[in-house]
Every structure is written in structure tokens, then in C-alpha cells.
Amino acid sequence: MKFSAAAVLAAAAGAHAWSNVTYTTEIVTAVTTYCPGPTEITHGGNTYTVTEATTLTISDCPCTVTKPIITTSSVICHSCTGYVNSTIPAPTSAGSVGTGSAPAVVTPTVSPSEVPTAGAGKAAALSGAGLVGVLGLAAILL
């Protein structure tokens, strides 16, 4: 009984982690797609055969196109201090022969870089799945 309750809980949590996708539906007068190789596409009862790489336009519409809305979060820090790369060799002066002053030393400046956050949602989903697995294991052992 404990195992079946844990299995149901794990399945529900897994389904919930992937069910928060929002879709948008649009009715268009034509659909254009790129086919990289030979294929067959069935749309609205019609079959379109592509024999080589081509751009295919389906114009016997209205056609309903449903797409997921994908959101991406990113962080850009404009006030962060830059990272000084210590592997850049220090600028040197060749010196001059004769009179005059030595050339000015140029110090390289480094601009701040963007913080990569691509895939953070996937990591969050996987950590939730890991937590469900640990809870399931605890339920089995109890």
C-alpha cells in the first residue's frame, strides 16, 4: 500500500512538472515550412509529397496552427564589476633610444559578461523529480 501511494504521488508530481505549457492557436491563410529532405505531410485531408529539400507553402487554407508559448528568463548585470583575466600578459614597453619620455602603459579593460541561465527551468524540473524520487524511497523504507 505504501508503494502504490508513493507511485501515485511520483506520477502526479511528474505530470505536474511538465503540464504548465501554454499554447496559442492562430488561423492563417497559408502555412510555409522548410523540408530538409524527402517527406510526406498530411494536412487537412490533403497529402503533400516532397522529394527533395525545399520550402513548402500550403495555401488551400484557412489553416489552424497551434504553437507552445516558450518563455525564457535571462539576467544581465550592468553594474557588476568585470572579471580581470590574469592570463593576459602584462603590457610591456620596448623603451626608446635617445631622449624623451617612455610611452604610456596601456591597461586592458574588461567589460562585464552576461550570466548564462539557459536551461534553468530544466534543472528546476529535474530537481523536483529528484525530490519526488527521494520521498518515494523514504515511503518504501518506512
From Swiss-Prot:
Q: What causes induction of this gene?
A: Expression levels may be influenced by circadian rhythms.
The UniProt entry's GO CC annotations, sorted and at most eight, read: fungal-type cell wall
A GO term, aspect molecular function: structural constituent of cell wall
Superkingdom of source = Eukaryota
> Per the UniProt entry, what is one GO biological process?
fungal-type cell wall organization
Signal sequence region = none
The UniProt entry's sequence similarity note says: Belongs to the SED1 family.
What protein name is recorded for this chain? Clock-controlled protein 6
- Which organism is this entry from? Neurospora crassa (strain ATCC 24698 / 74-OR23-1A / CBS 708.71 / DSM 1257 / FGSC 987)
